[in-house]
Amino acid sequence: MEGTFKIIIADERHTVFAETISKEMESSAKQRGTGIAKRTPKYIQEKMLEGKAVVALTASDSWAGFCYVETWSHGKYVANSGLIVSPEFRKSGLARDIKKKVLELSTTKYPDAKLFGLTTGLAVMKINSDLGYEPVTYSELTDDEEFWKGCRSCVNFEILQSKDRKNCLCTAMLYDPKEKAEVTVNSETQEQKPKLGPSIKQVFSALFLLNL
């Protein structure tokens, strides 16, 4: 896949794709019959100019996929949002590669932040799970009002409101870099821990056999 597409951090050169990306996000949501918060071309351009977006390009430098980073609660939480792949390249594994790249971008720019996402797509849930995200309750997400305001343009916003923001049709998933680091350290410690010598019972058994 990496040989077919260039997956890079977006910049000013890629703002020309913003309108196409915005329209494709809306079109994709309508086709799936699921909700998605709308993102204007201007908003997408801002993310590109801030260095908070990843774009996938074909060999001819045409747009193939996109995803961006948002921060909430003063940088304590990061969301990788707006994952979209051009229709002709779907089911090719490109979405997984884009998510991997944007995860790397997020953990590099915000190493202490918790990463989260909300999605109704089974494919995205599978990708997130493979990358280390885990399903959580909405209470574990950011309480930043600006984040939840972004859900207003979703067709399911009334459901979210009626549930007092405790749940909705989206599945919440969380990636905590600190927890992942602790698990890695503990695993390495276990592997490096020297094996204990024979037990007392084994020693006595050996001595008994020698005296036979």
Predicted regions and their residues:
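Conserved acetyl-CoA-binding loop-helix of GNAT-fold acetyltransferases
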Residues: V85, K91-S106, L115-G117
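Short amphipathic alpha-helical segments and helix-helix/interface helices
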Residues: I44-Q45, L103, M125
